[in-house]
Every structure is written in C-alpha cells, then in structure tokens.
Amino acid sequence: MTVGFPPAEGHGAATGRRALRRSGGGWAFVVGLLCAALAFAVLQPGTAAAQTASFANTKMPKADPNKKMLVTADELVYDYEHDKISAVGNVQIYYDGSTLEAKRVTFDRKANTLRAEGDVLLKQPDGKILTANTMQLTEDFRDGFLESLRVDTPDKTHFAATRADRTDGNITVFQNGVYTACEPCKDHPEKPVLWQIKAARIIHNQNEQMIYYKDATLEFFGLPFAYFPYFSSPDPTVKRKTGFLMPEFYNNSMLGIGAGVPFFWNIAPDRDLTFDPLYFSKQGLLAKGEWRQRLIDGSYNIRAAGIQQQDIEQFAGLPGYRENRGMVQSSGNFVINSQWQWGWDGTLTSDRTFLRDYGLIGAAETEKISQAYLTGQGDRSFFDVRGMYFLGLSVTDNQDLIPVVGTFNYNYVFGNPIFGGEAGVKVNFNSVSRTEADFVGTSAATSWVGGATGIPPGSCLLSNPNPTQCLLRGAPGDYQRLSGEFYWKKTLTDAAGQMWTPFASARVDVAHANISALPTNYTDGPTLAGQNVLQSGNDDLIRAMPVIGLDYRYPFISVENWGTQTIEPRAQLIIRPNETSIGKFPNEDAQSLVFDDANLFSVSKYSGWDRVEGGSRLNVGVTYTAALNGAGVISAVVGQSYSLFGKNSFAYGDMANTGLESGLETSTSDYVARFSYSPTNNLEFISRFRFDEENYTLQRLELEGRTSIDRLSLSATYGRYEPQPLLGYYQEREGVLTTASYKLTDVWSVSGGIRYNIAQASIDMTTAAITYADDCFTLALTYLSDYSINGPNNGPNNTVMLTIGLRTLGETKVKSAIGSSTQ
C-alpha cells in the first residue's frame, strides 16, 4: 500500500489524532523530498492522493531525484494538533545512502526535526554505524544530539559517549567520551578493551579531520596509565595530517639521555615536512628533519641533521671528536615511461661514524652507497647505468681505500631465432677510482686487526708490502674496462631422450689502467707460485675470448610404487684459447669465487667481468631427484671439473690471487656436492660439500636446516671452511647461526638468534625479541649484540629498543645503547 501525507489542517481537523494501522506483513511508501529535507516533506494545504508514490495537487519544489526516501514501519501515526508524524514499530528509513532504524521515529514538521527512540541505529554512507538510545536530528541529518551513543567505523575504530551534539554538519562533541581502535572480546564483550582513551570531551572536527581530547586518560585493560590535559590526533580516515607525532626516547653513554617529539607538516597533498629535534643531556640539541615531495612522474626526499656537540671529549680518539657534526641525505626515483626510470640516493656526512653515533642508521649497516642511476626494462632487454660512492661507517674504515665506481650493463635477447637457437648480447662497462692501495695480509702476523687510523700494520703497510704475505684487494689509481659478448645456444632432443645443447660465444674486453705508484718491493719482490702482481703505470689493454662447446644431458625417469626418481648424468665440453693478460687487468669485480654445485656447469666461473676463464675444460656431474609418495623430495648433485688442455686460468692468480686455493687450480678439480631433503613443505635440510680431489679431505662444508611446526619456526646454519691464506683467510673458519621464533599465542611471540664462532670459541652475535601484536596494539622489545660492526678488539655493539604502537594514534620508540659504546 502506498500512502501520502494528509494536510496539516482542513476538514479532517475534527479528529485531533488518527492512526492508520495494518495487520499484514509490512507496508512501504516512497515520498518526494525537498532538496534540503531529511525525513518528510512539509505539505502545503490541499487534498492528499493515495494512488501514486509522489504527492499530487500540492505546491512544493521539485524533489532531488538523488534524495528519494523509503520508509517502512508497522504503523504510521498522525498528530494534527502538534503537526507531527510518527512511524512506530520496526521503523526503517532509507535516505541518500543512509539507513535509520528505531522503534519509533517522530517528525516535527514545524521544527523540521526528527526524533528517533528505542535501539536507534544509523548507518551512514561512509560505513560508520551509530547506535544510541535516542537521536534528535535536523531534517538533513546534519545537526542534532544523541544520547547513550556508540559509533563504529569501517576501519574498526569506536566512539562512545553519554551524549553527543553535532552542529553545522561538521563538529561533533562527545560528552564523557571513550575512543578505542580495539575490538571487544567476542566471548566476554563486557571486559575492558586493551586500550582506550576516556575524556571529559572528545571533539571531532570533520572539516579539519582532527579529534581533540580534553581531560583525557589513557587506560590499559581498564586501568589508568597516563593523564593528558589536552591532546589531539587525526581522525582514523586521515593518512597524512599536520601535527605532533609520537615521542622518541634514547639512552647512550656518549650522548646521554635523549628525547624528542617530531612535528609533521602536511603542506599539500604532494609534499610534507617532518621536523624531528632530539635533545641529548650530554651533547645538546640534534636538529634533524625530512622533506618529501611527490611530482607527476616520481618522488624525492631530503633528510638533514646537525648538532653542535657540548662534550666532544666523549669521542676522544674517534672520528666524532669534533664540535660540529651533521649529514645530508637525499633519494629520488622518477619514471620516464613504462620502461625507463631514473633516480639517485646520496649521503654526505661530517665524519664516518656520525650516523651510527646518533642512531640514524640500522644496527647492522656498515656502509652507505651514494648513487645516481638510469634503468630500462624491455621485453627482451635490460639497461642499467649508475655511478656509486661507498661511504664506510665503521671506526676502522679508511675512505682512501674505498673506490668510486661507475657501471653500465646492457643485455639483449634477439626476438627471432638465429640458426634455430637463442642468441643475445651482453655489454658491461666498469670504472673504478681509488686513492690508496688496499692491501690485506695473508697470515695472522700480517693481517689488519683494526685500529682508529684504518692503516694495516706489519708487513702490509702501504710503504712496505710483501707480495708473499699480502694481496691487493683494490688497486690505487683509475681503471676503466668495456666488455662485450655475443652468445648463441640451441637445445636438441633426440629419439632416445638425450638432450644436446651446442653453444658458442665471443667476448672482447678493452681497458685502460692508470695505476698509481706501488712500492717497488711489492712490484719487484719475490712472489708465490701462480701470482701475477699488478704493476704501476699506464696501460691500454685488450683481450678476446671465443668459445664453442657442447652440453649433454640424459635424464632417466623411473616410476615406482614408492614414488618417482630421476637420474640425469651431465657433461659439458668447452673449447677456447688461453686467458691473456692475467694480472694486467686489475681484478675489482671478480674476487668472490666460490666453487660449488651452483657454478659447476658455468661456462665462466668467475663472479665478474675483470677475469675471464680460459683454457679448454670438461665439467661432469650427476643429478638425482626422488619424489617419495608421502615422504617428501630428495635431491642430490655431485660433480667435478677437468682442465683438458691450455692454460688453467684458476692456477694463475691476479692482484687478489683469485682462483688460487679455489679447488679449481689443479688439472682435476675438487669434488663438489649438494644434498637436500624436504620431508614436508615445512621441513628442509640442505648440505653442500667440497672435497679435496686427492685425499678427499673436507675443504668446505655448509649445513642448513629450517622448519616450521605449528607455532614454532627454527633455522640453523653451520659452516666450516679450511684456511685459504693466499686469499686472506689464514685461519680455519667455523661457525653456527641459529634462529628461532615461537608464537606463544595469537598475539604473543618470541624470537632470537645466536651466531657462534667455533674457531674462536665465542659468540659474536646475539639477538632476542618479544613481541605483542593484535588488531590495535603492538609492543616489541628487541636486543642486539654484534661484534661485526666494531671489530673484535672494540667490543660488541649492544642495543636495546622498545617499540610501542597504538593503532590510529601512532608509534613511539625507546632506544638505548648498553655496555660498550655504539661505535
């Protein structure tokens, strides 16, 4: 049944009150609204019609079609005497995206107000849900007051108050208000939530998107924790808002106790500024801040910090022994188009330990890389060019030994097959500049054990290095190299299932080396077998390396009742000439040679472009894989490499002795193997081995295991490596790294890790943490002790950090250095 409103006065006035009732399952009526009306339109005198969904024979403005209203109720009551209309029983009003539910809703046509009573619920278009005992609102829902109110937002924040008043469609004042971002306990909703803020008044300014609290108390589990006469925070819908952030606290023996309150300035939607001053009781005010801006094609930021230290004696004998200290950092990334982007990342400091001393970097950071870059990514190509400056952050770093580097890399795979196979090109350019030679000792007597000056003692002093006791990690002077390689390969499978992959490549390297004067006792002194000592002076270099080869694989597959197994023997024959100019090309990027199963079948096993493998070689091995029904997967690899004829590149060291003592320097290499077993998706064991080819003694061993069982996660890594004095490892290295985490409950977890140096019988890294995290609150206490930052003679770097986060309000950190200094 569709019903229209009767006139406010007229021939029906003899009956002061009339009720229309129904006995069926519900009725609905739709009425047109005036542009600003909320509930019911005010009718002009006339006769009401009941045949249509809109008013007829009335004089009223045209209703906004976007603000129609649907009302359902058990009964509609007209009060002509007081000019009121009431909907009674299971009332539901749908208007402009909002839904109002109540036991009774009364519209006062004179005052243009609406009063809802009894289990009132208002759902707003933005997802907010308001509940109250009573609501009195203006006709457009803009203003009004509510009693015994509760507001639930879509992002699970909640307000409650004994009364709330809304004015100007903007400001809502909650009397005796409560705010929380925590959900009540499902089983015991009567229990206090984890945290909540109670205030005499909570004021929400919707236009400012701010919430103001007056006479506020922060409670945890219903118990008062902190009192604030006044504070404010952005409302939960705001991601960026001008105002103060959560405070920060520090404690450090050299700096004293530190505290600060950052201020965030939301200048515009595309830019902001954070001013974050910290005052330290021993050193004074550290001024720091960050500017961020997003442009149409990217974004950038600038960070700066500076301090005039009040007590420089705390840093006596250290890089921080100066009055004025500071830094500037900046990074940016910009998109040129869908394939190209460019950017930078730069750091400039007054001294190398400023960032660590004042907690401006992570505990494990040992260097900062300043770089500018341009990269491109296509369907079959990759382009990258960048310049890099490495800033050492340790007390023992000598910046003159650290290079400035420029690199260029380009890879392209041809779209159309060439002779039926895949072909492509690789290009690399590298430029290295260094002020002083970087010598490293090959024994305990000549090794650099650290020190404030950063100059190695003993036989590896820059003025008197002995090539039989020292190797050159970095060449002084300037070095540029351009390399290009063309490659081709094609895989053929015959009727028997054998896989044949012929391949070929051609590479050319051209370089210019301007090596600063090296000590004559290094360049002219006695050398070890296989050493090729770098010489001083200018040199233009060129070398070429053509390669042809054949890769053969023959997989055998067996399907059994217990599972499926695959055995695949593999052989790789490589024919090429000898490597030329060994030792004349400074080796800057190919020093990290580790011979294992990962590079057993690599055509060139060097890690970079400064060395190229020469001489003909045969690589052989067998791979075994078994998928056990219900019992996991086993995988194993074993292999060996043979130098067939020509010069074995790995038997000839360069300035860093790369290749010597690698297991590849003899005509028959060491054996390499890998074995792994995964009984389930949550449990895995991996082992890697290298055995001497003559006596089968273990040269290199790595064992790793990791598992995740319900709430428990464990991992352990064990490594043992025989001495390689010609590479600077003059002692046996052996250690264990273990990590564990356990989820005590859905919200509580603990984690920790230990690195134990077996060779030195000492723990050199320890970490532990306990964390609480739920839907509204985070608490983390973390401890880290690490010797690797300061060096073994300077003691560990011990740090404790407490992090507390209240969802929607922010996060604060308390960081303290304990024990030895943070140097």
Q: At which residue positions do the language-model features occur?
A:
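N-terminal amphipathic/hydrophobic interface segments
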Residues: 48-176, 196-204, 209-211, 215, ...
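Bacterial N-terminal signal peptides
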Residues: 16, 21-44
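Local alpha-helix boundary/kink/capping signal
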Residues: 13-14, 43-45, 508, 575
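Outer-membrane beta-barrel proteins and related beta-barrel translocases across Gram-negative bacteria
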Residues: 134-137, 141-145, 152-173, 177-186, ...
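Immediate N-terminus of the mature polypeptide
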Residues: 3, 50-51, 78, 256, ...
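N-terminal targeting/secretion presequences
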Residues: 2-7, 11, 19-20, 42-59, ...
